[in-house]
């Protein structure tokens, strides 16, 4: 400071160099007003200053939480650097992103993040850009951004994979979603728990890959706290004529509980038993269904189960008559 205060008494070159040094020292000592003052004076005396002092001023204003002036200096520094073809560091762009983020200026956050993913492709920039796209309702752009990051092998965390899979499901591309989830599970990025396995099973099922969905649902059902996944399995087994497994899954669902309508599961169980010609256990299942439906005031299923009971009673009588006639 003593040298600076000499003004015209010292050589101009020494004064300019000293001003810059004092500005930096003031910043290190957290004397931000002094840092601003000496750097501004330096800029007026320096010959054709580069972008660096503007980035310095932006950093000082950032420390002072004057984000408007920090943005002004950052943008000016970037303009100078671009005009001269000099480098703009990742740190510079990241600071500008933060400043616009604090201002909730989302169009500019997106603009700067687009530069970061292009010039400094890292997971954090890709995921942040995708997040802002999603926040602002640009779901297509969010999907394309996460897809690009996935293709470039930047996705690492569970949320990266599950967010991408969720967007693919929304876009009705379940087979792609299933492959993303499967990849995340294989990499151990996604935890192999009931929720994530159920998501994978649903994706395979919607992709018409039932043979792949079933073993995943079996694994998930064993981990789940309730019987809802077993319930889903019972329907899949019924549709594919695997009646023994259908009965096992329906029983598992009823044992674990937590079902929205247990009477519906009793119907599936009864149908699968009936298809194995196990009429007595099937009737028992439909009787349970009718009882629960009555308790729940579910007249529709109460009627359906009653009709099944009547039908089974007639079938039992018919089979008994045939057996007697043949005997």
Predicted features, each with a name:
Residues 1-276, 281-327:
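Alpha-solenoid helical repeat scaffolds
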